[in-house]
């Protein structure tokens, strides 16, 4: 997978909020939880705003005209509205992650709907070519309120068919339309009755009248059923998902029936409704996939509308603004307080908007509203994880569930093949071939080769045509990047890696030898027992030496095939592990940063100059493969018709563990180590992780930006381990107190803990105090240098040190302690009895407090070394400290300068290496001043000694100091 300047292509699944926007008019339907408060967003063009809220207001009383004026009818309609509101307001778990106030009628952006004609429907499918753009150029757009307007000839429109490919938002559009009616926003209809064609098809041929179908689903409407005939066009039936229902409009197949109380097959009832033979004045809205449009003869349809998604970038931006600006979006799981601030949300939206403007490929992806949902869910996952156990793989699996759950490729086909299963076999093959050959751009021949592979019958060809019309655009998009025009790419890069992993774990990848071996194995399995029995009898009767050999061969065949399959699994595991630990990319970020960069438009990992420009990196492929083996994702995939057998999952996991055990023992760069941990996080199997990571002794994540998600990943994978970690290095990780709190189970296992350069303030010291006081704490070395702890923080920290029995080395270098902090340390140092080394250098302390701390250190029972260099010490103060440290009374040695009398301090290299390491982060003017003072000490000591060996040592150290000064001077200081 390459994460770089091109971005994933993004849109969202089976339904996300949308508005009916036109190129010259945008319509926003929004209602907020607080009455009278309008959302501040303003699209660049005029729009109409509607108000209402399902969260805290009951549906308004309907305007029933002359039809439903009776009290009983009015109450029945009101109960019906309330029931529909409750039912259609329920959101799947995947939507609830965006905050408790998120609701479909709170913020909604309708997709573009464009009117089409029967002639357009008869044109050959252009598959992935720019068919949508052609439609947009030729046909006018429609608003929801215009669907039943008279046609161009002035004729009344009674039946409207809306069609769109998978992911364009048909389901959400229907839900939003029903909720609009419930809140009085569709005054043209006094009664709305929605039907799910999936529900109707489940009834089979069981006879039921239209009245029974209505009352079984909407009990309150019993009161108004007698009035349906008189309702006319003010009665609206909504038939959602026509592709699920087999309709036969032939008179020989479905007889005429005009009585709503006459029982019949549900499909026959719908046919007579659509024929306008039953309730001829009623209005009907039908939604369907493109392949099923022809099931209704065009003479029964007054208007066709194509749902075209978010063809305008402004709609995409508006969707992201409304979705990501939810007030309750971004709070951590379990009340941990981790949240995305309004400023951070605004920054995300601005970066995403700039990316949409600058990179046409992500805009092409966001053409489908479902992929807009995926982008929002991914950003939410990366920046504000909300639920324990949520993984990147589960987001993609849920995304497919939202779009494909229960979807069959063709309801008329007896095989009842699931649409997702067909996609896994065809698109998964293309995706895996791309990963294997390291490419993301595919020619038309590549696509056709994977789609048409193995097709032999007319039925298989028909299924392929349905898939092309209904779902191909969901997975593939024309590439609009310069230099790759005429090729196709997966809608988002990560989808290629997900499908490739799915193709593997489903066992769809088989070599020719495996296919032949499987057939032989199945044949032997069918006849093996009988043949073995016959051979056994014959061998006893006739002295034929060949028969025992044949008998043994029959036993060997299953074992040979099993080994062949096992070798194939090991080969895949080997390729996956090698992909995960590739280091070819220069400045390779971890996969989470790569994914965020690709969505937000931040430049991704730079390539090494000698690397071929076409080389692709697919580091998410192993992550998805691991995630798909988790129990949760396997359960969801089974719902989609893609079951992964438990035995297959176990054997795949064993093969992966075998390879990881070998590769995982090597020392990895920090970003690669985080990828390794993320692999285990995706798997969600603590036993597997404990066995593979049992040999891990050093956790070096220095320089990795530890977001809340990454802290959760590390804590989840390593928090339950039992063996100690020799060193945990979290230097320069942008850690905050919340991150420290999350990582507490891991920090308790550390012996050496490095938290340098993390901008940790006094509030972080409370977590550090709790860490030090924990009865399982085994930290011996704690490095907190270059953090603004201040005197307030060190006071809290001393409370932890007072009760701690493990820490022997503590570094508080450059922690803004000042005189107050060192004075506090001097007063409370005796509360700890185990400390052996204390570094409080570069803290702005003066002579008095430095001397007081040095005296306290000399009295400490265990302290051996105290670092005080680079403080605001005078020449006299440094001399007093040198004299104190050089006295023969025992106690801690005090290091305040590069010299000890007329000799070089044995700690001179420690001091200068610390300066060199922090040269870019410390104040250059202040460092330069301190180095000049140290240089003066060296020169004075050199002038005061006659020992040539000491002079040579002093000259060498002077040279090192001058080199550092030149580096600072070369930087303009």
From Swiss-Prot:
Q: Which residues bind ATP per the record?
A: 164-171
Ranges of residues in domain LRRNT? 665-692
Q: Where is this region: Required for interaction with MAVS?
A: 73-554
Describe the location of the LRRCT domain by residue ranges.
904-968
The NACHT domain extends over 158-481
Q: Which InterPro entries match?
A: Leu-rich_rpt (IPR001611), LRR_dom_sf (IPR032675), NACHT_NTPase (IPR007111), NLR (IPR051261), NLRX1_C (IPR048900), P-loop_NTPase (IPR027417)
Where would you find this protein in the cell?
A: Mitochondrion outer membrane
Q: What's a single GO MF annotation on this record?
A: ATP binding
> What Gene3D superfamilies does the annotation carry?
P-loop containing nucleotide triphosphate hydrolases (3.40.50.300), Ribonuclease Inhibitor (3.80.10.10)
GO biological process per UniProt:
innate immune response; negative regulation of canonical NF-kappaB signal transduction; negative regulation of inflammatory response; negative regulation of innate immune response; negative regulation of interferon-beta production; negative regulation of interleukin-6 production; negative regulation of macrophage cytokine production; negative regulation of RIG-I signaling pathway
Transit peptide: first to last position:
1-84
At the top level, the lineage of the source is: Eukaryota
Q: Which UniProt keywords apply?
A: ATP-binding, Host-virus interaction, Immunity, Innate immunity, Leucine-rich repeat, Membrane, Mitochondrion, Mitochondrion outer membrane, Nucleotide-binding, Repeat, Transit peptide
Q: Where are the annotated LRR repeats, by residue?
A: 693-716, 722-745, 747-775, 776-799, 809-832, 833-855, 856-875, 876-897
Gene Ontology, cellular component aspect: mitochondrial outer membrane; mitochondrion; plasma membrane
Q: Output the Pfam families linked to this UniProt entry.
A: LRR_6 (PF13516), NACHT (PF05729), NLRX1_C (PF21402)
Segments for region (Required for the repression of MAVS-induced interferon signaling) = 554-972
Under the heading SMART domains, the entry gives: LRR_RI
**Would you identify the family this protein belongs to, as annotated?**
Belongs to the NLRP family.
Which function does this protein serve? Participates in antiviral signaling. Acts as a negative regulator of MAVS-mediated antiviral responses, through the inhibition of the virus-induced RLH (RIG-like helicase)-MAVS interaction. Instead, promotes autophagy by interacting with TUFM and subsequently recruiting the autophagy-related proteins ATG5 and ATG12. Also regulates MAVS-dependent NLRP3 inflammasome activation to attenuate apoptosis. Has no inhibitory function on NF-kappa-B signaling pathway, but enhances NF-kappa-B and JUN N-terminal kinase dependent signaling through the production of reactive oxygen species.
Tell what the record comments on domains.
The LRRCT domain mediates homodimerization and LRRNT mediates trimerization of the dimers.
Assembly and interaction partners = Homohexamer. Interacts with MAVS. Interacts with TUFM.
* UniProt name for this protein: NLR family member X1
Source organism (scientific name): Rattus norvegicus (Rat)
Q: Which gene specifies this protein's sequence?
A: Nlrx1
